[in-house]
Amino acid sequence: MKPVIHVGIDVGSTTVKVAALSPYMKLLFGRYERHMSDIRHMAMVLLHELREKFSGYRITASISGSGGMGLAKVMGLPFCQEILAETKAVQTFHPETDVIIELGGEDEKITYLQNGVDQRMNGACAGGTGAFIDRMASLLSVDAAGMGKLAEKAERIYPIASRCGVFAKTDRKSTRLNSSHYFESR
């Protein structure tokens, strides 16, 4: 009988993530890629890579994520709501955890794990999400990792409306125009 691997596919608003676990829950494969709005193509690229690497295995799989329901239906795979999937994973692999914070491409989620499970989500505004961070990085002509490097070198903190992407973009432009010291350490 072929050995089994368990595959999880998470399709978010901007990325596709694939992870494969052994029956003993050891991570065998993990990929995180931007789908550039072509979810099916990126999912197929990652699953083809997985199939080549584990051709002699029997595979169980399920899909989660805001963009995963349609893909699950097309592929005939079970769908699990992402907050439930990540809660189960954290409770399984890190049972000492009190809080899960997830910054998605277009929303934020927080799950409290004390005295039961309390899950909350901010889906009304993209401020502080992955898409927001990407946009701010683009405005500063760096990638998301480059923002961290800029922050390490900064000599001053400038106020930016972090609750709203529109106001943050306006604040960033205004600060840059009105300050000769803006990101002087770049």
Regions found by a protein language model. Give the residues of each.
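Short glycine-rich, Thr/Ser-proximal phosphate-binding strand/loop in the N-terminal lobe
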Residues: P3-H41, V45-H48, D118, G123
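Short glycine-aspartate micro-motif
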Residues: V4-D10, T60-S62, E96-I101
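Short beta-strand scaffold segments in enzyme catalytic cores
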Residues: V16-L21, D107-L113
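Short beta-strand-loop/turn "lid" adjacent to the catalytic site in phosphate-handling enzymes
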Residues: P23, Y32-H35, L50-L84, T111-R120
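Glycine-rich phosphate-binding loop plus the immediately following alpha-helix
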Residues: N115-E152, R156, C164
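Adenine-nucleotide phosphate-binding core of ATP-dependent small-molecule kinases
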Residues: A168-R176
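Single conserved hydrophobic/aromatic residue that forms the stacking wall/gate
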Residues: L177-R186
